[in-house]
Amino acid sequence: MDRIRRTERLAAMTQMLINAPNRSLALSTFCETFDTAKSSASEDLDIIRTALKRFHLGTLETLPGAAGGVRYRPYVEKEDAFAAVNALCERMSAPGRVLPGALLYIADLVGDPAALERMGEILATEYYDVEPDFVLTMEMQGIPLAMMTARALDVPVVIARRSVKAYEGAAVHITNPVGSSFKTMSLPKRLVKEGQKTVIVDDVLRTGGTLSGMRSLMDEFRVTVAGEAVLIATEEAYQADPDVRPLMVMEGVDAATGAAKIRPGDWLRG
């Protein structure tokens, strides 16, 4: 292989780190990949660490011990998180988004990879210290945000469903109230282990029935729920369940314009 210039090595190392969020990479990995000495690789990582911190692009931590290395986390400062969510609030407050029943149209946001990636990083920042074993969500619209959060945390996504297929094996089923009716929630036994920790991520908090059901489901598995977050919550639901971390809060509907009044979750104010 031709001699690798430092600028090339820095660019490639940065990409390797970004592609493996919250994952430990051994120093030897960089030494072998770029055929460089440990001292040179360490200097490169110091340069990357400084740049990430300066431009608020995340953190690069050194992990001690024989199995240690470095770990990149797409950490989002509170002021940056608030600004990003506030921009989404303005987008969601546009006229024409309020549907019959005071529901908010969010399908385009749920399908926006760039916006959801940032939201996932914001939620992951809140739960890095919790060190969950997986992210739990409910089909269907909660899946994209849960997936992005899990990616930033480097953990699997576990999806509760209204029914399970035969090929998924034995499952735990519960029945819980959702709105004005009762619905079944199911989860294959092989996906979760007793004693694990999870963070619940869903799309909307309106009546609280779905979140309550997922809590009950985790109780059946004896799994600790270490955090709960949603994309958007109604003001009433947020006040009733203040431990939930909503990215956005829908305060109501402007009678004059018919547009939703939406603000960032209070926890984002630092």
Predicted regions and their residues:
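Extreme N-terminal segment that seeds HTH/winged-HTH DNA-binding domains in transcriptional regulators
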Residues: 1-26
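N-terminal helix-turn-helix
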Residues: 26-58
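Minor-groove-contacting beta-hairpin "wing" of winged helix-turn-helix DNA-binding domains
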Residues: 58-73
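Active-site-facing substrate-recognition patch
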Residues: 71-131
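Short glycine-rich phosphate-binding loop at a beta-alpha junction
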Residues: 132-139
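Short, glycine/charge-rich flexible loops or terminal/linker lids adjacent to PRPP-binding catalytic cores
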Residues: 155-199
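Acidic, divalent-metal-coordinating active-site segment for phosphoryl/phosphodiester hydrolysis
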Residues: 202-212
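PRPP-dependent phosphoribosyltransferase catalytic core
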Residues: 216-270
